[in-house]
UniProtKB/Swiss-Prot annotation:
[4Fe-4S] cluster binds at C62, C66, C69. It catalyses: (4R,5S)-dethiobiotin + (sulfur carrier)-SH + 2 reduced [2Fe-2S]-[ferredoxin] + 2 S-adenosyl-L-methionine = (sulfur carrier)-H + biotin + 2 5'-deoxyadenosine + 2 L-methionine + 2 oxidized [2Fe-2S]-[ferredoxin]. This is Biotin synthase. One of its GO terms (molecular function) is biotin synthase activity. Binds 1 [4Fe-4S] cluster. The cluster is coordinated with 3 cysteines and an exchangeable S-adenosyl-L-methionine. Binds 1 [2Fe-2S] cluster. The cluster is coordinated with 3 cysteines and 1 arginine. Keywords: 2Fe-2S, 4Fe-4S, Biotin biosynthesis, Iron, Iron-sulfur, Metal-binding, S-adenosyl-L-methionine, Transferase. GO terms for biological process: biotin biosynthetic process. Its cofactor is [4Fe-4S] cluster; [2Fe-2S] cluster. It is an enzyme of class 2 (transferase). It comes from Clostridium botulinum (strain Alaska E43 / Type E3).
Length: 318
């Protein structure tokens, strides 16, 4: 039995692989690794595919200096800037997405965190969404504390999103205005508040494969529910506008490794896949079982109708 199959069988028997074993796997053939990751997904997660959409609920003028982000005040980009969206716009979007077949809907806002007044406004909006449609609500409002997260939970939010972005080791290379530990604390507080957690990161920032593996193991330790993996889309004006893009093999290997490390979780294809020539179809055969559909925060995405068609053709149930 080869190394890939040996570790696959270990996972299917109920054990978890170690970081050392993940690094060994990272040296293996990408196509064989992807096929095994798909076997793990099929055996442990089945055919169900989870689709979510996001809306940019507050855009630009962010005081954080994340090098990849078009919304940071540190960079001169062409993105639209606006304050918190009105409730009607958010509710209309939620209902529209629900009617298109999406399972989850998230409001994502720029900035380190929302103000108390803004939290009260979005909580009222979430309650109104729940009265009008059955879509599952997610939220991404920055580094909130426990009490603020409890408010979200009480308003109908089921899952809180807060990306680690990368490994602890590499984090200070992409952001210095907040810390990796602040993110960890937010995730722990969300779990304590009774919320599910969606947390992943961005690949292609200049990090190593070991950094990605480290991030995956941190997420496993935190026991998050959904792991969105974004592929860097270098945006003109940001510090990473000239960052070299990852090869599709490198991207595929990363997604497959995340399935090996987090065998029963939602490995979610997120931003950047519109850059891929097959819109991520290869990744959906490499361990992925969820995706963000539609537009991203500041870049165009893939229409939900087209996503559902492709996902069903691949044998998934949406």
């Amino acid at each position: 039995m080869n190394i890939i199959d040996r570790f696959k069988e270990k996972i299917l028997s109920g054990e978890l692989i170690s970081k050392k074993e993940a690094i060994i796997l990272s040296k293996e053939n990408v196509d064989k690794l992807a096929s095994a990751a798909n076997d793990i997904r099929m055996s442990l997660c089945g055919k169900k595919f989870n689709l979510c959409t996001i809306i940019n609920g507050k855009s630009g003028r962010c005081g954080e200096n994340c090098k990849y982000c078009a919304q940071s005040v540190y960079f001169k980009t062409d993105i639209e800037e606006y304050n918190l969206l009105d409730s009607e716009s958010i509710i209309t979007s939620a209902i529209s997405n629900y009617n298109s077949g999406v399972h989850r809907f998230s409001v994502v806002t720029s900035g380190k965190k929302l103000t108390n007044k803004e939290i009260d406004i979005v909580c009222k909006t979430y309650s109104e969404v729940q009265e009008k449609c059955a879509i599952k609500l997610c939220a991404s409002h920055g580094l909130l504390n426990y009490e603020e997260l409890v408010k979200l939970k009480e308003s109908g939010v089921i899952r809180y999103h807060n990306n680690l972005e990368t490994s602890r080791r590499f984090f200070s290379n992409i952001c210095t205005t907040h810390t990796f530990d602040e993110k960890i604390n937010t995730i722990k507080n969300a779990l304590k508040a009774g919320l599910q957690v969606c947390s992943g990161g961005i690949i292609g920032l200049g990090e190593t494969m070991e950094d990605r593996i480290d991030m995956a193991f941190t997420l496993r330790e935190l026991n998050v529910d959904s792991i969105p993996i974004n592929i860097l889309n270098p945006i003109k004006g940001t510090a990473l506008e000239n960052q070299e893009k990852l090869s599709y093999d490198e991207i595929t290997k990363t997604f497959a490794l995340f399935r090996f490390i987090l065998p029963e979780k939602q490995i979610r294809l997120a931003g950047g896949r519109a850059l891929l020539n097959d819109k991520g179809e290869r990744l959906m055969k490499s361990g992925v079982n969820s995706a963000i559909s539609g537009d991203m925060l500041t870049t165009s995405g893939i229409k939900t109708f087209d996503d559902i068609k492709m996902i069903k053709e691949l044998g998934f149930e949406v």
